[in-house]
Amino acid sequence: MHLLPELASHHAVSIPELLVSRDERQARQHAWLKHHPVPLVSFTVVAPGPIKDSEVTRRIFNHRVTALRALATKQGWQIQEQAALVSASGPEGMLSIAAPARDLKLATIELEHSHPLGRLWDIDVLTPEGEILSRRDYSLPPRRCLLCEQSAAVCARGKTHQLTDLLNRMEALLNDVDACNVN
């Protein structure tokens, strides 16, 4: 289920392409749930800027696949089906996991908080009925920025940081994880 970093497209995606890609992901999620009636873990990489498919985003994606598989194994949850693909919005993955959706969401939130690359992961958990469980459902604060302690959404809207600073931070986090052999 891992993606080969050397095959990254480096395509600079436009806003309309990104919006279409998000709609397509939502349609894939609902089609997936019709064929796999257990909770769905759907995940992407948080990648600032127009290039969503790069060696860095694919390597981050691959770390997340490994971490999610390890989480399922640790919890004794069965992965019933899995898929990886690349869309205009970058690497995407889907795992059907036989586990209570609420437990899955809480475990993935903990993974996002505890893993060094967690801030770069966007992990959605959908119930078999298609309801997306949100961080807000658990009274959790929004994601924090990569560079400061503000809300990531506030910094993104205000363009608080230079894109190069964000991309350099992403790569530094990834290199640290690789150097320490963290999965």
From Swiss-Prot:
Catalytic activity: apo-[citrate lyase ACP] + 2'-(5''-triphospho-alpha-D-ribosyl)-3'-dephospho-CoA = holo-[citrate lyase ACP] + diphosphate
Highest rank taxon of the organism: Bacteria
InterPro entries: CitX
GO MF entries: holo-citrate lyase synthase activity
Residues that span the membrane, as ranges: none
Pfam families, per the entry: CitX
Name of the molecule in the record: Apo-citrate lyase phosphoribosyl-dephospho-CoA transferase
